[in-house]
Swiss-Prot record:
GO cellular component terms listed in the entry, alphabetical order: plasma membrane
CDD domains for the chain: MFS_Azr1_MDR_like
Name used for this protein in its record: Efflux pump mokI
Listed transmembrane segments: 30-50, 90-110, 125-145, 153-173, 185-205, 233-253, 261-281, 307-327, 340-360, 364-384, 394-416, 428-448, 509-529
Entry keywords, A to Z: Membrane, Transmembrane, Transmembrane helix, Transport
Designated gene of the protein: mokI
Biotechnology: Monacoline K acts as an inhibitor of HMG-CoA reductase involved in cholesterogenesis. Its hypocholesterolemic activity might be useful for lowering cholesterol levels in the blood and reduce artherosclerosis and coronary heart disease.
Bilayer topology: Multi-pass membrane protein
Induction, as annotated: Expression is controlled by the monacolin K cluster transcription regulator mokH.
Provenance organism: Monascus pilosus
Amino acid sequence: MASHQSEKEKPQSCTTEVQVSHVTGLKLGLVVTSVTLVVFLMLLDMSIIVTAIPHITAQFHSLGDVGWYGSAYLLSSCALQPLAGKLYTLLTLKYTFLAFLGVFEVGSALCGAARCSTMLIVGRAVAGMGGSGLTNGAITILASAAPKQQQPLLIGIMMGLSQIAIVCGPLLGGAFTQHASWRWCFYINLPVGALAAILLLAIHIPKSVPTSDCTMPAPRAVGVRVILSQLDLLGFVLFAAFAVMISLALEWGGSDYMWDSSVIIGLFCGAGISLVVFGFWERYVGNSMAMIPFSVASRRQVWCSCLFLGFFSGALLTFSYYLPIYFQAVKDVSPTMSGVYMLPGIGGQIVMAIVSGAIIGKTGYYIPWALASGIIVSISAGLVSTFQPHTSIAAWVMYQFMGGFGRGCGMQTPIIAIQHALPPQMSALGISLAMFGQTFGGSLFLTLAKLVFSAGLDAGLREYAPAVSAEAVTAAGATGFRDVVPANLLSQVLLAYCKGIDHTFYLAVGASGATFLFAWGMGQVGLIWWGEERTGFGRDERV
């Protein structure tokens, strides 16, 4: 009986595809530009607020709300990502993407016009709701607009260029706050987002969808009642409960509440129960109705790609958050110059994202790039963990470039693996899971990195500067501790800071090593990803 049900629910492969006319030439360039701008804005929105928070809290007298300015966005984004993937399978691709962009823009406008802290938090939550479908939609649009051989290059361009926002965000936030107003950290999204929307509206984006003999229906214009019947709202509620509780536990643990407090333990237990019930419910309703079909989530290529992207994001954000701390706290440079010092990593990442994408598109081999990424980024993080106050310019330039080189090699490979493993009309669901893995993995590793850094800094102060108050150094912050530390003890405190930062990059070593392991599960080593199979590592599973 069980085997019969499993066989019945297993999605059938599509034998024929609708013949589509892909976008070419200038129009394709405009599509790539538009979706890259949108993803850039989304990532910028997540990082630009960092340097604006002191001014926001001063104006609204809301120091106690600082954590919510980031977590409100994260909570709504994580909770809605699988639902966003489901919507892309039910509705017209371009207009669904524009709807998510519109919600993101409304949230940005609310943040910019906020008259109190509560209004700003609501705006951040609304922006997160819109952002939940942007990266997924951008990748799906590229998959629809271009033939498979071009997609690795285009995805590499989009992901490589948009990641600049993670580093540029704090710099732009500081510039807007200092020379204009913190409100422009959010208002900047409005004209750029409107430009991207106009470009997309002017271009016809085809639907590359197989015939209807597959389990999931093709994207189409349907009524509200039909949409609601297909959305698996109970599944959404259960998954949202899991996402909200696990995110709050990570956000509050160690700061607002002790890790062993009843609140944090209760959140973890509630998240676990919600996830288990969600899994049983999705299995019960079957592949055709589930928000996350079991046949999608259980695919080896899919869950390995999600885990790859989660650990990849953890390593990336460790570099992005703690290298500026090293440059500003230890090297004593301005925020602007710390951004300049990050350019070697950004440059290597952009170049290799484009180069690897082009080569994958020509050869079809993507697993070797994922494996190389794990190795190279692990080595880079290990080298960065040796940073000291007097580390030479040549060393930190080369170590960063190596890290960017490695990240560029592998950043688009999990998306390609998912697109290969699933039928086109199911790929949006798989990519939405990958985006959740990326968001959740990044959040988890930032929480762990914060704990490791604090522990390493405290240990370093006890070892190198026992006469200095650890509480005073921590309270002064990474750019203010020089004002509270005696000049004769500053060099010892810098060593302590290096120890905290170095220990943090041990996490990046581990995360990158994990990407190497999960890369083996993303497909065959010798595989032409657009269909032709060659002899390689193991046997590839196909839907």
